[in-house]
């Protein structure tokens, strides 16, 4: 028998729109995708990464100039999956706005910082966490050495990406990511991960209330 809580959590709300051809039903995420809103929620892994990349490419094809909004609530996950999303965000022509709701940890924080400059936001009670990549390996000693070198290469590359998007020095980023570093929304703003902390939706983006 399936867990009723799990069943409930897997239910996706449907919304109904009136069109010239009658009623049309969408799941809530598809409806918001029509508004150029992408949800990046849960662990970052290959399946989720593929869906996010596909949505980014679809919205670029729909309109190569209009802004895309990405709402992030993620504990992080697989580095290569996150970098696939990151590279696509940089590759496509539309500017990508990012907004942290809940948390943006590990790869989630990197994707939050990767939004278009001056278009990276956080809600006031969101939490952001940055740290260096981690991994566990087993096998022959030579293979373990190769994996260790690869994770050091990834660490260096991730540090460089944070430097690019935060404006911090490499040494500052390296020191900050040495251990899990937890940040409030305002701390993340001071660190350069986001540009503004917003607590109300404004009628005009430029008029958004900031902290």
Curated annotation (Swiss-Prot):
Name the Gene3D superfamilies on file. 2-enoyl-CoA Hydratase, Chain A, domain 1 (3.90.226.10)
Specify one Pfam family.
CLP_protease
Q: Does Cytoplasm count among this protein's keywords? A: yes
Q: Does the keyword Hydrolase apply?
A: yes
Q: Which UniProt keywords apply?
A: Cytoplasm, Hydrolase, Protease, Serine protease
One of the GO BP terms on file: protein quality control for misfolded or incompletely synthesized proteins
- State the compartments where it is located: Cytoplasm
Q: Which family does it belong to?
A: Belongs to the peptidase S14 family.
Q: Which HAMAP family match?
A: ClpP (MF_00444)
Q: What is this protein called?
A: ATP-dependent Clp protease proteolytic subunit 2
Species of origin: Bradyrhizobium diazoefficiens (strain JCM 10833 / BCRC 13528 / IAM 13628 / NBRC 14792 / USDA 110)
Where is the organism placed in the taxonomic lineage, from the top? Answer: Bacteria, Pseudomonadati, Pseudomonadota, Alphaproteobacteria, Hyphomicrobiales
Q: Which gene encodes it?
A: clpP2
């Amino acid at each position: 028998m399936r867990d009723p809580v799990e069943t409930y959590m897997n239910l996706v709300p449907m919304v109904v729109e009136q069109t010239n051809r009658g009623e049309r039903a969408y799941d809530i995420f598809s409806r918001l995708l029509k508004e150029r809103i992408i949800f990046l929620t849960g662990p970052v892994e290959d399946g989720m990464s593929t869906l996010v990349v596909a949505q980014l490419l679809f919205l670029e094809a729909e309109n190569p100039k209009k802004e895309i909004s990405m709402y992030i609530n993620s504990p992080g996950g697989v580095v290569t999956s996150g970098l696939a999303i990151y590279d696509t965000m940089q590759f496509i022509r539309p500017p990508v706005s990012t907004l942290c709701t809940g948390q943006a940890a590990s790869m989630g924080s990197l994707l939050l910082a990767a939004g278009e400059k001056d278009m990276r936001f956080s809600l006031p009670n969101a939490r952001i966490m940055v740290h260096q990549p981690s991994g566990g390996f087993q096998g022959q000693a030579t293979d373990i050495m190769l994996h260790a070198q690869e994770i050091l290469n990834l660490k260096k590359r991730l540090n460089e990406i944070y430097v690019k998007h935060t404006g911090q020095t490499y040494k500052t980023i390296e020191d900050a990511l040495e251990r899990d570093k937890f940040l409030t929304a305002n701390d993340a703003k001071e660190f350069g991960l986001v540009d503004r902390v917003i607590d109300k939706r404004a009628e005009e983006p430029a008029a958004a209330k900031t902290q």
